[in-house]
């Protein structure tokens, strides 16, 4: 492992180390990719936590009940592996596959202003949640918002009418009273 960081703006968080596994330095990882095993397609990761940055290489990985179990190059001790708990797993944005014109990565949606069919500004997308049925956007108020309410909006075709990344706006079909 070395400590040469990528440019922070070029990195995308794709997972998180949450625990250790066994005594040989393996770590348990929660993957934000879909399917979760896609995280194993990236052989080099940048790890970040509380201002610390580390570059690591993936040796192997496999699925487990609560995510993935991963072996990193040069990490052979349980105590050393425990120190990585809480680290975000990042990859360069340039490694993400291209999407169709009407598809978006979550990171592209975060920060968009959310405006409904009545031109009411609800706020900005703060983050998204995976619920099983459909993804849910957490919209928090911002300057100029209709009110101070946090809203949970489904990320579905019925709700999301249009997305304009350049303008930083998402148009939705959603009543202000919901």
Curated annotation (Swiss-Prot):
Residue ranges occupied by any PRC barrel domain in the UniProt entry: 101-178
Keywords: Chaperone, Cytoplasm, Ribosome biogenesis, rRNA processing
Subcellular location: Cytoplasm
CC terms in the record's Gene Ontology section: cytoplasm; ribosome
Coiled-coil segments: none
GO BP annotations, alphabetical order: ribosomal small subunit biogenesis; rRNA processing
Molecular function terms, GO-annotated: ribosome binding
Family: Belongs to the RimM family.
Assembly and oligomerization: Binds ribosomal protein uS19.
Domain notes for this protein: The PRC barrel domain binds ribosomal protein uS19.
Protein role: An accessory protein needed during the final step in the assembly of 30S ribosomal subunit, possibly for assembly of the head region. Essential for efficient processing of 16S rRNA. May be needed both before and after RbfA during the maturation of 16S rRNA. It has affinity for free ribosomal 30S subunits but not for 70S ribosomes.
Listed NCBIfam families: 16S_RimM
Annotated protein name in UniProt: Ribosome maturation factor RimM
Organism of this sequence: Pseudomonas putida (strain ATCC 47054 / DSM 6125 / CFBP 8728 / NCIMB 11950 / KT2440)
């Amino acid at each position: 492992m070395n400590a040469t960081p990528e440019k922070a703006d070029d990195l995308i968080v794709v997972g998180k180390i949450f625990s250790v596994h066994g005594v040989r330095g393996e770590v348990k990882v929660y993957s934000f990719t879909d399917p979760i095993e896609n995280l194993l397609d990236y052989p080099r990761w940048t790890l970040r936590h509380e201002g610390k940055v580390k570059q690591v290489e993936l040796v192997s990985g496999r699925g487990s009940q609560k995510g993935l179990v991963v072996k990193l190059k040069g990490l052979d001790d349980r105590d050393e592996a425990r120190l990585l708990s809480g680290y975000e797993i990042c990859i360069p944005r340039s490694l993400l596959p291209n999407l169709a014109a009407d598809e978006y990565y979550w990171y592209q949606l975060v920060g968009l202003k959310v405006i409904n069919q009545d031109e009411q500004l609800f706020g900005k997308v703060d983050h998204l949640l995976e619920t099983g049925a459909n993804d849910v956007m957490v919209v928090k108020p911002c300057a100029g918002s209709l009110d101070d309410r946090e809203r949970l909006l489904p990320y579905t075709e019925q709700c999301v009418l249009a997305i304009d990344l350049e303008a930083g706006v998402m148009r939705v079909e959603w009543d202000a009273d919901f």
